[in-house]
Amino acid sequence: MGSMGGSRHLKAINAPRYWPILRKEYRWVVKSSPGPHPISRSLPLLILVRDMLGYAKTGKEARRLIAEGYFKIDGRVRRDYKFPVGVMDVIEIVGVNKYYRVIPVPTKVLGLIEISREEASFKLCRIENKTTVKNGHIQLNLHDGRNVLIRVNDPRNPVEDTYDTLGVLKLSIPVQQILDYVPLKEGVIAIVSGGRNVGRVGKIVSIHKGMRRYRSIVTLEDKQGNKFQTSLDYIFPIGVEKPLIKLPEGAW
């Protein structure tokens, strides 16, 4: 007998701890559909609309608003209330000129910060890996599931490939034009996307490479001069001289 696949249902008690839901009031909670972010690092659009933005009091109200096309993610209307929303996604409330970015925050892991219309025109995406495709072109695979193709004139000397794994692209949305690039190196500003220091912002002081990425340790220094460490896997570069995105007051 073949496998029946994963369950389409999720008990509230088993949902990621950072989801802002009333676990004792409801037995079941909406489960994210397959999409650009894993369930461990995202939350369903319905929970964002109802529990974080407060545009609905019930799941039924949230589903209706989403189905009517009132919410854009990264410049595109999303009508699937289970659509997974994750780090650096840009949310637009259609018709009211409100824009938000999902960022890592202390304790809550994922939070929203209101941004300007100008800032809502771009997104930061971390390069997770690179692959060589037909004709020697380079494909950059990003943290939110999207891919960017770098066209190469001479595969034997790919001078166009100036991007490294774990660096960050500043992309226009929804058209995906590369506007800027932040490499992963000492001296750049980064935000921590997970672990006990989630949401902290600092300048990278040193990178100690291990046998695996999760064993590599990065030391950062915050604006107050306090040093802290985290896994390389949690490092998300956000700027060289200054952050490219708006951050909570006091973060940097």
Swiss-Prot record:
SMART domains assigned to the protein according to its UniProt record, in alphabetical order: S4 (SM00363)
Question: InterPro entries recorded for this chain?
Answer: Rib_uL2_dom2, Ribosomal_eS4, Ribosomal_eS4_central_region, Ribosomal_eS4_central_sf, Ribosomal_eS4_KOW, Ribosomal_eS4_N, S4_RNA-bd, S4_RNA-bd_sf
GO molecular function annotation: rRNA binding; structural constituent of ribosome
Q: Name one GO biological process term.
A: translation
Q: What are the residue boundaries of the S4 RNA-binding domain, all occurrences included?
A: 43-106
HAMAP family in the cross-refs: Ribosomal_eS4 (MF_00485)
What name does this protein carry? Small ribosomal subunit protein eS4
Q: Which organism is it from?
A: Desulfurococcus amylolyticus (strain DSM 18924 / JCM 16383 / VKM B-2413 / 1221n) (Desulfurococcus kamchatkensis)
